[in-house]
Amino acid sequence: MIKKFKLPKNWRTQLIIEEYRYSRKELEYRLKLKDKDIGYLSVLKKGKYFFVKVVSVIPEMRGKGCGSMLYEHAINQLGRLSTNYHAASSLAQRVWIRLIKKYEHTDEFFTGILTVYKKKD
């Protein structure tokens, strides 16, 4: 029998994002609730770009804003975040569409690279 994950009432205030740096070019942000991994976002630096490699959120936490929280944390930490938009899944594209409404962005049409920038204070 699979044990269902139960959320505490104030779960959003208990979330922690930890950074793991694997090299100068590769890092990961992990979203945790207490000791449970909720999701992660992996980034690879290529030249001036910080490309999202993988984003994953456990099924029980999908649709609750956890993925968006990881994207926004990465943007705020790195200053910008990029994707090859046409290679992104339809779910990821929906997140990117929400991000471009909130952040400055550039779209390099011929390369298919979409970059979202942290707003200047």
Go through each PLM region and give its residues.
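Conserved acetyl-CoA-binding loop-helix of GNAT-fold acetyltransferases
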Residues: 57, 63-76
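Conserved donor-binding loop and adjoining core beta-sheet/short helix segment
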Residues: 33-53
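Conserved beta-hairpin
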Residues: 16-20, 24-39
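C-terminal "cap" of GNAT-fold acetyltransferases
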Residues: 108-121
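Conserved acetyl-CoA binding element of GNAT-fold acetyltransferases
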Residues: 48-59, 84
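Conserved N-terminal entry element of GNAT/NAT acetyltransferase domains
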Residues: 1-19
